[in-house]
Every structure is written in C-alpha cells, then in structure tokens.
Regions:
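Binuclear metal-dependent hydrolase catalytic cores
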Residues: 1-126
Length: 126
C-alpha cells in the first residue's frame, strides 16, 4: 500500500493568488503547495481522499489514470470543488465511482454538483 499526498497547502494554496507566501520561503520549491488531496494506492485500487480544486493538476503530476473510490473528509470548497475532474474516470470506465461521505457532505455534494451524480457517481453516507 502506498499513501501519496497530492496536495498539502492551505485552503487558498501556497502562494495565495495574491502572491502571499506567509512564513514560507518562495525560493524553496517545496513551498509551492496545492490544496489538500491524497491517494491510497493498493495493488487493486486507487482510493482518493478529497477532490481539491487543484485535483486535475495533482493527478497529472502523479500520472494517476485510475480512481476507484473517493472519500470526503468534509464539505469545504477546498476539499470538494475538484469533483468535476472525476468525470473523466467515468468516461474511461463507464462505471460509477463509489463516493463515501458523511450525511452533511453527501447532501452538499448532491445539491451543488447534481450533474456528477446522474450517472457518474454513487454515494454512501457514513
């Protein structure tokens, strides 16, 4: 099993869109951080934790071409607004992705991204 941190920046990323780095040194490449997402990779499955708005960039950078399941930690924008990028995995497999979230997050996702749940995704509330 591998655990891959796809992003570990703040809710606005580092640097922020206005160029602010906070206490991070802009000369250090490691201080350019995308928003939080992670991947659990097993021999059979790729399990994504959260879909940050930077998800497309993260998946391309790590050459991830398959997602089987998605777990959402909570319903904030920096954990959920990359959900649209999951559509390509349905297009490739024609199989709905399994999504796991608590009831509040599940409701939020279905209310705000209903088009993703028509065929693409099945949800289980935790």
């Amino acid at each position: 099993i591998k655990f891959i941190i796809l992003g570990c920046g703040s809710s606005m990323g580092v640097p922020r869109p206005d160029g602010f780095f906070g206490n991070c040194d802009p000369k250090n490449k490691k201080n350019y951080r995308t928003r939080c997402s992670a991947l659990i990779k097993t021999t059979d499955e790729n399990i994504l934790i959260d879909t940050s708005p930077d998800l497309r960039q993260q998946l391309l950078r790590h050459k991830i071409k398959k997602i089987d399941k998605v777990f959402y930690s909570h319903m904030h924008a920096d954990q959920t607004h990359g959900i649209n990028d999951l559509r390509s995995f349905y297009i490739n497999n024609r199989k709905p992705l399994e999504v796991y979230a608590d009831k509040a997050t599940s409701h939020y996702l279905k209310q705000n991204f209903s088009y993703c749940f028509e065929l693409l995704i099945t949800t289980t509330s935790l």
